[in-house]
Every structure is written in structure tokens, then in C-alpha cells.
């Protein structure tokens, strides 16, 4: 879903459209559930209460749920010319998602680093300009570790001073 927003952003940058509706939906199928269950990635499998607790010591996986979202993206000047209220502006985007592939930790860290680097470069920002990191943070120990390592690698010693949010734990 986020890749759909990134693709829409790039299409608007390339002047392929002025307005794009982008988003996504996730519907749980038994196959999807079984994949996550068999890999031990679901919260609550150890008898504890299901909870999404990204970066928490008590985390034990994610809560599988259905959801959807849609956003409307517009070329900025087009939106301003028509008097639209601007809620946010996408300044850069980076994604290195490869679904269905299981990579070693160092490869995963590198891919997350590249996504953050691409987003910063696309926005013309330096790491010192960042005031908040919105992590994927799905509550799985392995993925949280990968993201934490990538954040440390990109932002260095200053990473401990930048708040890290985890919206996925609240909205999926």
C-alpha cells in the first residue's frame, strides 16, 4: 500500500498526472494466516495476550488484521491553484520491499538503510534535518532488530535523540 503511494508520488513528479488516488487493502486469507502462523510471527502464540508492541522487550510478533486506506495525492501547485487544503507534502520516498523473499539479517539491514537513504536523497535532506522516524515496526523481534540497526547506521550517535514512532501498531 505504501508502495502505491510512492509510485503515485513518482508519477506526479514526472508530470504523468495532477491527481492520483492511491492506497491499498489487506484481506486475511487462510493461506496468509498459515504462513505467518507457521513462521511463528503472530503475537500471542506463546500463550500471552495478543498485542502489537514494537521495540518493546515484551514484543512477540504482530496481530494479523484486515484494513485499508486511501489518500489523494496532487501536484502541489495544482492543489494550491484550486485552493485545496494541504495536509502534508511528500518530499522523498524510498522502498526496497521484496515480498516473499527471506534474506539474511545483514541484507535486510542494508535494504532498510537504502530505503531511508533514498527517501532522504529524494527530499534533498540531511540526516540532521530529521525530527521523527516513522518505522515499520511490526513487533517481530527480528524485524525490529533490523530496523534498529539500520536507524543506528544511517543516523549514527544522534539516532538516540530522534523519536521513533510505530503507527502500524495502532492502525496496521
What residues fall within each predicted segment?
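Short glycine/threonine-rich loop-to-helix capping motif typified by GTGT followed
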Residues: 100-109, 138-155
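Condensing-enzyme catalytic core mediating Claisen C-C bond formation in acyl metabolism
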Residues: 47-125, 131-132
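Active-site-proximal alpha-helical scaffold in enzymes
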Residues: 1-26, 63-84, 172
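Beta-strand segments within the central parallel beta-sheet cores of soluble alpha/beta enzyme folds
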Residues: 17-26, 85-93, 128-135, 161-168
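Conserved small-residue
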Residues: 1, 8, 36, 72, ...
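Short acidic, glycine/serine/threonine-rich loops at helix termini
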Residues: 5-6, 30-36, 100-103, 144-146
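Conserved catalytic cysteine-centered active-site region
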Residues: 1-7, 16, 38-63, 149-172
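Fold-level recognition of mixed alpha/beta catalytic cores in primary-metabolism enzymes, strongest
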Residues: 24-27, 35-40
Amino acid at each position: 500500500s505504501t508502495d502505491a503511494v510512492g509510485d503515485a508520488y513518482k508519477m506526479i513528479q514526472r508530470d504523468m498526472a495532477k491527481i492520483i488516488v492511491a492506497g491499498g487493502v489487506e484481506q486475511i486469507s487462510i493461506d496468509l494466516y498459515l504462513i505467518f502462523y507457521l513462521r511463528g510471527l503472530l503475537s500471542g502464540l506463546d500463550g500471552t495476550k495478543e498485542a502489537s508492541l514494537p521495540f518493546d522487550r515484551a514484543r512477540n510478533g504482530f496481530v494479523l488484521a484486515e484494513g485499508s486506506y486511501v489518500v489523494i495525492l496532487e501536484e502541489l501547485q495544482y492543489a494550491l491553484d484550486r485552493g485545496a487544503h494541504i495536509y502534508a507534502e511528500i518530499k522523498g520516498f524510498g522502498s526496497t520491499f521484496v515480498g516473499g523473499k527471506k534474506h539474511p539479517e545483514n541484507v535486510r539491514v542494508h535494504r532498510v538503510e537504502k530505503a531511508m537513504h533514498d527517501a532522504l536523497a529524494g527530499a534533498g535532506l540531511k540526516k540532521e534535518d530529521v525530527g521523527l522516524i516513522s518505522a515499520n515496526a511490526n513487533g517481530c523481534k527480528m524485524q525490529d532488530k533490523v530496523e534498529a540497526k539500520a536507524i543506528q547506521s544511517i543516523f549514527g550517535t544522534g539516532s538516540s535523540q530522534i523519536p521513533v514512532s510505530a503507527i502500524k501498531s495502532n492502525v496496521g
